[in-house]
Amino acid sequence: DVYKRQKYNLIANDIIIGGFSQGCMITLQTGIKRKDTVNSIVGYSGRIISTEHLSKNIVSRPNIILMHGDLDQVVPIESLLEAKEFFGKNNYEIETKIFKHCEHRIPTEGSSLGLQFIKKHFDL
């Protein structure tokens, strides 16, 4: 919120947003519609809720990594492939990772990759 951003002297580029499953969906729907671009989006096992709506409302271009398990039965792996296609058509360069033999969860490797992605975009 605005109070915390002012208290900690944060600008949008100091912020990373992310989520798992529905949290990822909300992050994707809101993250690229922000007028003040956040640094990055880290998404696990989500999908774009409405590509048509989102394509008409693109405002910013944060760094994005999306990860998904190939055995996910809650949010099928096709969701990642559709998101990758959407972002490609809209001239985004995103990173993706598909985890083999992984259902609807965040594997340890996913946590590590998310952290590496964050460090890379903050030069840590």
Question: What do these predicted ranges mean?
Answer:
Residues 2-3:
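Short, small-residue-biased leader/transition segments that mark boundaries at the very start
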Residues 9-19:
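Alpha/beta-hydrolase fold nucleophile elbow
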Residues 18-23, 27:
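Gly/Ala-rich beta-loop-alpha elbow adjacent to hydrolase catalytic centers
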Residues 29-33:
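Active-site signature of alpha/beta-hydrolase-fold catalytic machinery across serine-
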Residues 36-49:
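A conserved short beta-strand
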Residues 46-64:
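Flexible "cap/lid" loop of the alpha/beta hydrolase fold
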Residues 65-68, 72:
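Short beta-strand/loop motif that positions the catalytic acidic residue
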Residues 81-124:
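C-terminal catalytic histidine-bearing segment of alpha/beta-hydrolase fold enzymes
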